[in-house]
């Protein structure tokens, strides 16, 4: 008999097609997206309810998963389900325009917001780590981070290499749910990529889904591939089986001895969770898995020391004049806590490359076809091009995405668009559902990593102009406004991306079912959501955001005086 409430060998896949298993599309949508998060083609470890990002789960236990799905199937259009850290705790009477689901995951009072306290609660069955889109049921597989990574690499190429990454190579670590986007994003940006990953099954998964081109078992083998591709001007990627905390320092040693040097260095190991996400040097994956059960503290101590070694190497690359960036997994903070004083010598990716986009409310807009039909996504791709004819960069992205990105679970698309354009696209998609161009409704959401929905001083809000990095009123206001505006489900999480104590963030998803009611909700939600990002950055003193707010006619009395 299985006594672990978080383990089950069931295979979960979202229903496809126009038939409902809930009372309306407003409850069918969260039901399908929750199930899609645990699709074996989507989730990193679905049998343990883990979607991505270390232990980012979709539900607290399998019993909770069953209770959530049962509640969603019976929920009326005037009721709202409350989910507390992956557990369905209440159904309350609300109204038709209210969210059908409100979710709060992993939130702790600040003084107690530590991994030690969270792990204690988690062990007792009182909490669940929701990451960002795992516990908010809008994870779309590795595609969800591809364009953001692509935009980052393109901007790095523009700043450091005259906009041309041909013949250049990027060194990184981690091929999990988020990190797995890096090799494909690098190739799309015109560069080669060497990605170090300690778990061979993850490399094989990325090979199968065409996110990485080749696998190597030794550093020499991987470097030979990189050398061949860069000399030929080809953009290709290799996943190297190894530990980043060993490979990065070894590459520094070789570089100092006149060996190969990468052109850009970053990392997306699951360093945000030292206990569950990072493999210590000298340990096997199996050994770490066993020790996490028998002696979790020893894993954490060893992992932290290894992270310091990796960051020391990254600082050495930076000191050698190589563009080096933290990709938001809090690895610099851990290294600093371990005594590495100059751990923050190199910048995070948001202040270095992404913030000007956030100032205009531009961020990771995404949608999924509840029909399960890829043609619905291809039709929406065409609609995006039609409605945004002058955005050639976006057109290029959509063309590459169609050619290179394999759908995982329900077909989905991500594209970075901003204030005004999100609303325009959402209304157009709703019209396509209404007139039968699409075979079923779609859901529209985003990552919590967005312009106005997150406070994370070591990632999205690092080095804010006015010093407001740690002010977390903004994601709270974002969640409240999306609730008031009529999003289909709204989530408020803590600790995503960078780990306990380092972030608070909000998510929203809205269903376009073709109705007039949906039209009104889409109009409000898809304007207000990115507008909070423009507001937040305008308040911090960014001129781009101030200009955008004025151009779009935002009323910001305490900021613009209107």
Curated annotation (Swiss-Prot):
Principal localisation: cytoplasm
Gene Ontology molecular function, alphabetical: urocanate hydratase activity
Matching InterPro entries: Urocanase, Urocanase-like, Urocanase_C, Urocanase_central_sf, Urocanase_CS, Urocanase_N, Urocanase_Rossmann-like, Urocanase_sf
Catalytic activity: 4-imidazolone-5-propanoate = trans-urocanate + H2O
PROSITE patterns in alphabetical order: UROCANASE
Swiss-Prot/TrEMBL keywords: Cytoplasm, Histidine metabolism, Lyase, NAD
Subcellular location: Cytoplasm
E.C. designation(s): 4.2.1.49
Active site: residue positions: 415
Name of one Pfam family that matches: Urocanase_N
Pathway note: Amino-acid degradation; L-histidine degradation into L-glutamate; N-formimidoyl-L-glutamate from L-histidine: step 2/3
Any one biological process term the GO annotation gives: L-histidine catabolic process to glutamate and formate
Cofactor binding notes: Binds 1 NAD(+) per subunit.
GO cellular component: cytoplasm
Residues annotated to bind NAD(+): 53-54, 131, 177-179, 197, 202, 243-244, 268-272, 278-279, 327, 497
Top EC class, one word: lyase
Cofactor(s) for this UniProt protein: NAD(+)
Keyword Cytoplasm recorded: yes
Function: Catalyzes the conversion of urocanate to 4-imidazolone-5-propionate.
Entry similarity comment: Belongs to the urocanase family.
HAMAP family registered for this protein in UniProt: HutU
Protein name per Swiss-Prot or TrEMBL: Urocanate hydratase
Source species taxonomy: Bacteria, Pseudomonadati, Pseudomonadota, Alphaproteobacteria, Hyphomicrobiales
């Amino acid at each position: 008999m299985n006594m672990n409430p978080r383990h089950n060998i069931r295979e979960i896949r979202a229903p496809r097609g126009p038939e409902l298993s809930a009372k309306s599309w407003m409850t069918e949508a969260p039901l399908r997206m929750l199930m899609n998060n645990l699709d074996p083609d989507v989730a990193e470890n679905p049998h343990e309810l883990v979607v991505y990002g270390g232990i980012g789960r979709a539900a607290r236990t399998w019993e909770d998963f069953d209770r959530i799905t049962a509640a969603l199937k019976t929920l009326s259009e005037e009721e709202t389900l409350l989910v507390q850290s992956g557990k369905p705790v209440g159904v309350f009477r609300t109204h038709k325009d209210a969210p059908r689901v409100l979710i709060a995951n992993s939130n702790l009072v600040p003084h107690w917001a530590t991994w030690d306290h969270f792990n204690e609660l988690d062990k007792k069955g009182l909490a669940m780590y929701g990451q960002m889109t795992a516990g908010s049921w809008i994870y779309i597989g590795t595609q969800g981070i591809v364009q953001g990574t692509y935009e980052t690499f393109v901007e790095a190429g523009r700043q450091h290499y005259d906009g041309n990454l041909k013949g250049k190579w990027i060194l990184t670590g981690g091929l999990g749910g988020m990190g797995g986007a890096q090799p494909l994003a690098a190739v799309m940006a015109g560069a080669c990529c060497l990605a170090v990953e300690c778990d061979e099954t993850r490399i094989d998964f990325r090979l199968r889904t065409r996110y990485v081109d080749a696998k190597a078992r030794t550093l020499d083998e991987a470097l030979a591939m990189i050398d061949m591709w860069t000399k030929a001007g080809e953009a290709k990627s290799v996943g190297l089986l190894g530990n980043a905390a060993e490979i990065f320092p070894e590459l520094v040693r070789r570089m100092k001895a006149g060996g190969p040097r990468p052109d850009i260095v970053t990392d997306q190991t699951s360093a945000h969770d030292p206990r569950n996400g990072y493999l210590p040097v000298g340990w096997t994956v199996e050994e770490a898995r066993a020790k996490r059960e028998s002696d979790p503290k020893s894993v954490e101590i060893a992992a932290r020391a290894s992270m310091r070694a990796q960051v020391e190497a990254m600082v050495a690359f930076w000191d050698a004049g190589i563009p080096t960036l933290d990709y938001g997994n809090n690895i610099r903070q851990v290294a600093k806590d371990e005594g590495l004083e100059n751990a923050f010598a190199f910048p995070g990716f948001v202040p270095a490359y992404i913030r000007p986009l956030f100032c205009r409310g531009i961020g990771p807009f995404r949608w999924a076809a509840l029909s399960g039909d890829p043609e619905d996504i291809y039709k929406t791709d065409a609609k995006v091009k039609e409605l945004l004819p002058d955005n050639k960069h976006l057109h290029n992205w959509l063309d590459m995405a169609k050619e290179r990105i394999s759908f995982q679970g329900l077909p989905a698309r991500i594209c970075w668009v901003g204030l005004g354009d999100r609303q325009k696209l959402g209304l157009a998609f709703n019209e396509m559902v209404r007139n039968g161009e699409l075979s079923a409704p779609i859901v529209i959401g985003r990552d919590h990593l967005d312009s106005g929905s997150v406070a994370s001083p070591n990632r999205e809000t690092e080095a804010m102009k006015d010093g407001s990095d740690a002010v977390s009123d903004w994601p709270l206001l974002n969640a409240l406004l999306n609730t008031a505006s009529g999003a289909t489900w709204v989530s408020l999480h803590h600790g995503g991306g960078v780990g306990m104590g380092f972030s608070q963030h909000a998510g929203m998803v809205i269903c376009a079912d073709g109705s007039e009611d949906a039209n009104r909700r889409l109009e409000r939600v898809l304007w207000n959501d990115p507008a909070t990002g423009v507001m937040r950055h305008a308040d911090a003193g960014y001129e781009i955001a101030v200009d955008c707010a004025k151009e779009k006619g935002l009323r910001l009395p305490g900021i613009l005086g209107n």
